[in-house]
């Protein structure tokens, strides 16, 4: 088991968790993998990778992104599958100035696992809450 949505103190004002404490806690819980998905930034990636190696756990590197499609908010977590995916996350994080377009998310999602993420305030959550199958289906088609 692994938590696939973990923010660190590099997600300013969103998490007080220091990377080493996060890794040690996950290891104490018996996890062999630890995931980092800071919000719109990747400043902690190198430190995270080095600490994971130091503590003999497998790093999963990701990015939490706010996006806009048809003037509606969407929220995603992208996890790098390989080095190319990691490079794409670096590129995406370097252009983020608030929300990024859905097209930019799609462009840089290659070689990444894409998850929806929400605090219940994005459009995808509204589609689910209102069981709007037509809009859900259309959205899934866009993501293919």
Model-predicted segments: where are they?
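Phosphodiester-processing cores and adjacent nucleic acid-binding clamps
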Residues: 1-144
């Amino acid at each position: 088991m692994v938590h696939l949505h973990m923010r660190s103190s590099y997600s300013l004002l969103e998490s007080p968790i220091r990377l080493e404490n996060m890794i040690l806690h996950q290891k104490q819980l018996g996890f062999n993998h630890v995931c980092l998905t800071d919000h719109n930034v990747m400043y902690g990636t190198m430190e995270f990778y080095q600490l994971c190696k130091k503590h003999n756990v497998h790093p999963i590197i990701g990015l939490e992104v706010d996006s806009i499609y048809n003037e509606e908010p969407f929220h995603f977590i992208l996890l790098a599958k390989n080095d190319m995916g990691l490079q794409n996350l670096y590129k995406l994080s370097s252009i983020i100035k608030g929300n990024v377009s859905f097209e930019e998310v799609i462009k840089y999602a290659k070689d990444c696992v894409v998850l929806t993420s929400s605090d219940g305030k994005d459009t995808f959550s509204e589609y689910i809450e209102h069981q709007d199958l037509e809009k859900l289906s259309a959205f899934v088609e866009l993501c293919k």
